[in-house]
Regions:
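Second-shell loop/turn segments in exported
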Residues: 6-11, 35, 86-91, 101, ...
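Stable alpha-helical elements in mature extracytoplasmic
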Residues: 3, 7-8, 16-19, 29, ...
Length: 386
């Protein structure tokens, strides 16, 4: 399973990505494939490793609030150290359902993870470090394997845009360790581009176009290497992405909005804690929750607003005018009292690429826009129809 971070389906053309395109031509292209909402990386890496929505796996965003880890603010799930702390305080329940690594092990099979993405997204693919473990740019698990990995692959290269040196090194790791040494039954390969480049440089930029060319060449190298090893006829290849991508034009933040409108005491106060789009209200105060929802609903850059279901399974939230957590499979013990979405449009950027959201930044993802929701899935191999 090859995850090309942030790969929009419309990036994949014969001209821009000939190797990925050709794989689809000899296999299948899933035109209606979709990301899990919120359309952020660690929510979806958890879904890859569990087959579940956040309502079951418990990773609610790229940043999550768990009082047992930090009572005053949310923490980034991009750092594996934070997730290890969550794993510790929950008795091994960083993800609250069984993972693929565990399921494969119970069947006598091995998982291996090779990733140039964040340590957090890598950890969530195999949090119990089953099979051949994890080789990531920022960490190696089990730690006892690090010296051997560094000896085989050499030092970790400096970060670049596109992040070609790191991506090449991690694919070398897949081949030399995941395939040659462990003979893994299943491998997750996570390539940090085009996301890594598109965030600061934008969709359609020279740099992002170069990133697409680079990752396509690396996919081609991987496929040729498997063929040279005589493994192409017995390997099913899935190329996917964790989310799509949009141009971002927003200038505002939810904490500032709530403070300005008098429903949060200060940016640092704990009466209301904001963790990305999730809002946690002290003691789940229903009046405060309703007041915050009303502020959000009257703000033009805020899109859909979600609250706990009025009744279990209902599409309507408990606060009038909101959708329910159940409608997006987000109801979990770690869920906030409110979840917000940013507004979005079909507007094109200066390079002609459609999809614009009112999140802050140059380009990114996270909303319910079809340009964020619609991700890539291409598959080919002996077990897949042609």
């Amino acid at each position: 399973v090859i995850v090309l971070d942030g790969l929009r389906p419309d990036y994949v053309t014969q001209e821009a990505m000939p190797n990925v395109y050709a794989l689809g031509q000899r296999g299948v292209v899933c035109a209606n494939h979709h990301s899990v909402f919120p359309t952020v990386t660690r929510v979806n890496s958890s879904t890859f490793s569990t087959g579940c929505y956040p309502a079951r796996h418990g990773i609610m965003g790229n940043t999550i609030y768990v009082p047992a880890v930090d009572k005053e603010q949310g923490f980034s799930t991009g750092d594996a150290k934070n997730l290890m702390k969550l794993n510790e305080v929950t008795g091994g329940k960083v993800l609250t359902v069984p993972t693929l690594g565990e399921i494969l092990e119970s069947a006598g099979m091995k998982l291996f993870v090779a990733s140039s993405g964040s340590s957090g997204s890598s950890f969530l693919l195999n949090p119990h470090v089953k099979g051949g473990g994890i080789v990531n740019t920022e960490m190696v698990l089990p730690e006892s394997a690090k010296a051997h990995v560094d000896e085989l692959l050499g030092p970790v290269p400096d970060e670049a845009i596109p992040n070609a040196p790191a991506n090449r090194r991690i694919i070398d790791g897949l081949l030399r360790i995941g395939v040659d040494e462990h003979q893994s039954n299943m491998i997750f390969l996570w390539v940090t581009d085009p996301d890594h480049t598109a965030h600061p440089k934008g969709i359609g930029s020279v740099e992002t176009t170069a990133a697409l060319k680079h990752v396509d060449e690396e996919v081609g190298r991987l496929l040729e290497s498997l063929k040279a090893k005589g493994l192409d006829d017995e390997t099913n290849i899935f190329i996917t992405s964790d989310h799509g991508f949009s141009t971002q034009t927003g200038k505002n933040s939810i904490p500032q909005l709530l403070v300005q409108r008098g429903v949060k005491k200060s940016l640092a106060s704990t009466d209301v804690i904001v963790s990305e789009g999730a809002v946690y209200v002290d003691n789940h105060d229903p009046d405060k929750t309703r007041a915050i929802v009303e502020v959000l609903q009257s703000t033009d850059w805020i899109g859909a607003v979600f609250t706990k279901a009025k009744t279990s399974g209902d599409i309507d939230g408990s606060v009038p005018g909101t959708f329910s957590f159940d409608s997006i499979y987000w109801d979990h013990d770690r869920a906030g009292d409110i979840l917000t979405d940013a507004n979005w449009s079909d507007d094109a950027n200066d390079k002609g690429w459609k999809g614009t959201t009112l999140l802050q930044g140059v380009a990114g993802h996270g909303t319910s826009s079809p340009y964020d929701i619609h991700n890539t899935l291409i598959a080919a191999g002996p077990g897949i129809k042609q």
